[in-house]
Amino acid sequence: MSKTYHFIGIKGAGMSALALLLHQMGHKVQGSDVEKYYFTQRGLEQAGITILPFSEDNISPDMELIAGNAFREDNNSEVAYAMRHQLPFKRYHEFLGEFMKQFTSLGVAGAHGKTSTTGLLSHVLKHMAATSYLIGDGTGHGAADARYFVFESDEYERHFMPYHPEYSIITNIDFDHPDYFTGLDDVFNAFNDYAKQVKKALFVYGEDEELRKISSPAPIYYYGFEDTDDFVAFDITRTTNGSDFKVRHHHKLIGQFHLPAYGRHNILNATAVIANLFIAGFDMKLVAEHLKSFSGVKRRFTEKVINDTIIIDDFAHHPTEIIATLDAARQKYPNKEIIAIFQPHTFTRTIALLDDFAHALNEADSVYLAPIYGSAREIDKGDVKVEDLAAKVERPAKVISVDNVSPLLDHDNAVYVFMGAGDIQLYERSFEELLANLTKNNQ
């Protein structure tokens, strides 16, 4: 008889993906969370997984409990109940560290690009071998006969320390999560500790100065655009249909590839995947074939057209990610005005990276800013406001409210890029409704 898994905080990106994976493996899965809609719950609902309001009545002693990292005895009735009755529970990353031991595991770590790279690696590998995977966009898949397991490896609060994968990619090291990390040295130390746990091979971006200092008992392969790298992407052509490039390993051509994705960062992500699969012994012709059909991951350059208006939704919430997303938009739409609509995520990050955010947003033609989205972990002390960021942006920059997004209509032949990790999608939805109403009124 299969176990029943109960997820405390099932709508979290990693939690929902793990719930789907276990459900597909034949286990009984349920979970609880707040009632507010979150984009991950659609997949859970489609799978028929029950989502309950938080209540200690949801828990019984025969269940295996998995608790989201944000939920503690003092802020969640179910965690409090479990602790009061001495019912064991694991955190997401603790469970995952044990779970992956039954597979050949391939991790993807890094400050930026984890989700897109995990999605790409999962997509290609699942077409060549039975593969289970967890992607940070809330997507999870459990193959009953899986030999391989691909997963996103998160550095926040050093959650990746229970992981000991056979292979891992590290896309980059950058200062983020200032509510936890004390500085770049602290971030580096976390990734360096993780790298020491990789067993067979580590693949790191060679032009990242911090990653060049990483050490590991496993062989380290550098990938990138420079001849000093072990895997080099070259002969690159970026068009409105995607990116074409070749990859060589130690001066020997290993393949020619087309990726239907945009931006320099996605070429790097693909090169990391190619390097990993080459070292793992997979046929590069098959890898090239399956790269062609990659359709992306949720909330990473997700496009839609409303009333002939192009809207892009992206999770970008760090200056490096904003630059990458706007670069991708310019590649696909070189003759259109690029409009950035950005919501800063957390007061601590906004304070720490205020000048960097302003610099990144200057890559757009016009900028609109939503009020800062505070984390549940922090209190707004009034130290920073979104108007402070608007004042530093050199491009035309305005602050908008979710109730009035009409200033966005002041542009012709434009692409609207909504970016953020908070509730920026509410602003996007308001804009979509405004466009739809304009269509009705013009009929």
Swiss-Prot record:
GO CC term (a single one): cytoplasm
| Lineage top rank: taxon | Bacteria
SUPFAM superfamilies with a match to the protein in the record: MurCD N-terminal domain, MurD-like peptide ligases, catalytic domain, MurD-like peptide ligases, peptide-binding domain
Q: Where in the cell is it found?
A: Cytoplasm
Key word Nucleotide-binding present: yes
Q: Its GO biological process terms?
A: cell division; cell wall organization; peptidoglycan biosynthetic process; regulation of cell shape
Q: Does the keyword Nucleotide-binding apply?
A: yes
Keywords for this protein: ATP-binding, Cell cycle, Cell division, Cell shape, Cell wall biogenesis/degradation, Cytoplasm, Ligase, Nucleotide-binding, Peptidoglycan synthesis
Q: Which residues are ATP-binding?
A: 110-116
* Subcellular location, principal: cytoplasm
Pathway participation:
Cell wall biogenesis; peptidoglycan biosynthesis
What EC number(s) are associated with this protein in UniProt?
6.3.2.8
**What Gene Ontology molecular function terms does this protein carry?**
ATP binding; UDP-N-acetylmuramate-L-alanine ligase activity
Gene3D superfamilies xrefs: Mur ligase, C-terminal domain, Mur-like, catalytic domain, NAD(P)-binding Rossmann-like Domain
Describe the reaction catalysed, as an equation: UDP-N-acetyl-alpha-D-muramate + L-alanine + ATP = UDP-N-acetyl-alpha-D-muramoyl-L-alanine + ADP + phosphate + H(+)
Q: Which PANTHER family match?
A: UDP-N-ACETYLMURAMATE--L-ALANINE LIGASE (PTHR43445:SF3), UDP-N-ACETYLMURAMATE--L-ALANINE LIGASE-RELATED (PTHR43445)
The record's listing under HAMAP family reads: MurC
Family under the similarity heading: Belongs to the MurCDEF family.
Job of this protein: Cell wall formation.
What's this protein's name?
UDP-N-acetylmuramate--L-alanine ligase
Q: What is the gene name? A: murC
